[in-house]
């Protein structure tokens, strides 16, 4: 299904060619939704950008474009506003025809990308022997949303979890457990994640204070890297214990992801160093192998290198990231690789990507993107922590959201005098609580910090998950009240747009595909949230002003079709955010 924006763009390109010649066939006419609805539905800003090139006034250029523009049955006669904006008002009859096409489309008119690409989205990436905390929330749900958007656009998406499952910390932990709890190194389920975290902290304290223990820990690392069967088995047990706990979180959040941890790339690290050395990129600095890069300096202004091999011969995150990048390009054959991490890692990835380009690891046809995000803050404006100052565990944060959602639901049921089953209450509380956390995060521009507030995210008014879920449930109540089966509504029935609020709703429904394309380009999920929120508001205005069940035919069926299309659009949009819908709330 061709979107209105695409159709208008094609018409304007044809007009540009007619007015100014074939060399203008590649120029973007810059068609966007109108900034002020009173002037129209869409506007083209091309006349202003062509003024210098053509040496004419923008309004004169705009008039020449209009003189050569044929909109067929799509829009009214265009008008010129301000310095040269071309405004177009879409005809209600055209809107109705397009809405019917969207109604009959299983994808609701969402277009597939062209070309289809192999894309890797690297997100979540917790560390073994540590619990997932609030800091993992944003990477996990932003990465999942981006993957869902790319998938609905038809791309081949590989979701990768680059878990921290390798390094000195394992030698430290294994050495410590061998002393205090050797069963944990031979028996599955001997520890839960809480025990593992406690032992890790104790091992770290011992490592920092005891030089002899440091040597023991390093020997364990050497044995692990050499493939010693006993040490490797202990490492696998520790990884599996953490992995089970991670999966509990992923199940709660409905996250599908393929684990490929740092250890996977360990056999490739030596070759990465050789490759960088062969290309003359390595320089020794204080015994470490480094790559010096343009544009990176420390606070004193001295060159800041990327260390790829430590002075003791060990490797680090940068080495692993370079090996992972090469593997993803050569073996996974990715054409686009997206890294979703906090903004604090922006400098690291900028260095890694620059080294990879210098080493010719990244071909010109492969796009590498870092998607940074800001902090989650408490209502005091500081980084979100517990009252004692420790990092909040993600599981605790999610559980508390469900508890708050249940309290709100039970209060509302009491006020309404409704009796519901325990299964209903538990299910609605779970969906609303988890959805509220997700939506509160995704509705923010990811580059910004945001304030985490259960009260705000669980509110039934405003740009929140409960408001969206309630809008969907309200439409389902219409079908129950009128005993309507939306799926069996007359397929050939026409959509009739008469009232201003139903015209506005119809126009907005047709922007779905454009919004999803925009999110793919910008990787900003909040744009989809904004669209769904505005759609919900437009539906509510339509419902308040346009009788549905009490209307006479054919208006009754037409308005029911608009209700159905709105519900399906909300359901699809929320699913791309990882949020399920509720038939009743």
Swiss-Prot record:
GO terms for biological process: arginyl-tRNA aminoacylation. The keyword Cytoplasm applies. It is found in: Cytoplasm. A motif ('HIGH' region) lies at residues 126-136. It catalyses: tRNA(Arg) + L-arginine + ATP = L-arginyl-tRNA(Arg) + AMP + diphosphate. InterPro entries: aa-tRNA-synth_I_CS, Arg-tRNA-ligase, Arg-tRNA-synth_N, Arg-tRNA-synth_N_sf, ArgRS_core, DALR_anticod-bd, Rossmann-like_a/b/a_fold, tRNAsynth_Ia_anticodon-bd. Its EC number is 6.1.1.19. Pfam families: Arg_tRNA_synt_N, DALR_1, tRNA-synt_1d. Its main location: cytoplasm. GO terms for cellular component: cytoplasm. One of its GO terms (molecular function) is ATP binding. Keywords: Aminoacyl-tRNA synthetase, ATP-binding, Cytoplasm, Ligase, Nucleotide-binding, Protein biosynthesis. HAMAP family: Arg_tRNA_synth (MF_00123). NCBIfam families: argS. Monomer. Belongs to the class-I aminoacyl-tRNA synthetase family. This is Arginine--tRNA ligase.
């Amino acid at each position: 299904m061709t979107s209105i924006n695409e159709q208008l763009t094609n018409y304007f390109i044809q007009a540009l060619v007619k007015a100014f010649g074939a060399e203008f066939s590649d120029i973007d006419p810059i068609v966007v939704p109108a900034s002020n609805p009173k002037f129209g539905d869409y506007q083209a800003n091309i006349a202003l950008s062509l003024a210098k090139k053509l040496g004419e006034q923008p309004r004169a250029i705009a008039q020449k474009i209009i003189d050569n523009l044929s909109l067929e049955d799509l829009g009214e006669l265009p008008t010129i506003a301000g310095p040269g904006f071309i405004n177009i008002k879409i005809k209600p009859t055209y809107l109705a025809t397009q809405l019917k096409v969207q109604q009959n489309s299983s994808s609701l008119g969402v277009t597939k990308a062209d070309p289809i690409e192999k894309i890797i989205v690297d997100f979540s990436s917790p560390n073994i022997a540590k619990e997932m905390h609030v800091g993992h929330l944003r990477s996990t749900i932003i990465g999942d949303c981006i993957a869902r958007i790319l998938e609905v656009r038809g791309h081949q998406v590989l979701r990768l979890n680059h878990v921290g499952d390798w390094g000195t910390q394992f030698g430290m932990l294994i050495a410590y457990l061998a002393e205090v709890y050797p069963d944990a190194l031979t028996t599955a389920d001997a520890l839960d994640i809480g025990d593992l975290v406690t032992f890790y902290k104790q091992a770290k304290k011992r490592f920092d204070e005891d030089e002899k223990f440091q040597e023991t820990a390093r020997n364990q690392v050497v044995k692990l890297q050499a493939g010693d069967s006993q040490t490797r088995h202990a490492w696998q047990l520790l990884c599996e214990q953490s992995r089970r706990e991670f999966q509990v979180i992923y199940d709660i959040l409905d996250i599908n992801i393929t684990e490929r941890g740092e250890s996977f790339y360990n056999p490739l690290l030596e070759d990465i160093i050789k490759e960088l050395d062969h290309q003359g990129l390595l320089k020794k600095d204080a015994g470490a192998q480094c790559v010096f890069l343009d544009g990176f300096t420390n606070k004193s202004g001295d060159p800041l290198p990327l260390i790829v091999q430590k002075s003791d011969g060990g490797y680090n995150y940068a080495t692993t990231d370079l090996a992972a990048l090469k593997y993803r390009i050569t073996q996974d054959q990715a054409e686009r690789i997206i890294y979703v991490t906090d903004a604090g890692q922006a400098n690291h990835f900028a260095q890694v990507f620059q080294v990879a380009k210098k080493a010719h690891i990244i071909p010109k046809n492969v796009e590498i993107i870092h998607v940074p995000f800001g902090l989650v803050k408490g209502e005091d404006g500081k980084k979100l922590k517990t009252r004692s100052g420790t990092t909040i565990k993600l599981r605790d944060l999610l559980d508390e959201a469900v508890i708050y959602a249940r309290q709100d639901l039970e209060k509302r049921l009491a006020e309404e005098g409704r009796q519901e089953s325990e299964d209903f209450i538990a299910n609605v509380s779970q969906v609303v609580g988890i959805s509220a956390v997700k939506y509160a995060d995704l509705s923010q521009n990811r580059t910004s910090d945001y304030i985490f507030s259960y009260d705000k995210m669980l509110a039934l008014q405003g740009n929140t998950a409960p408001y969206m879920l309630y809008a969907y449930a309200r439409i389902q109540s219409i079908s129950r009240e009128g005993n309507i089966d939306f799926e069996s509504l007359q397929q050939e029935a026409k959509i009739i747009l008469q009232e201003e609020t139903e015209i506005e709703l119809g126009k907005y429904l047709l922007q779905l595909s454009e919004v999803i394309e925009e999110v793919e380009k910008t990787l900003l999920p909040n744009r989809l949230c904004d669209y769904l929120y505005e759609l919900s508001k437009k539906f509510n205005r339509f419902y308040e002003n346009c009788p549905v069940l009490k209307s006479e035919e054919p208006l009754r069926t037409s308005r029911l079709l608009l209700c159905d299309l709105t519900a399906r659009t909300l359901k699809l949009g929320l699913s791309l955010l990882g949020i399920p819908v509720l038939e009743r709330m």
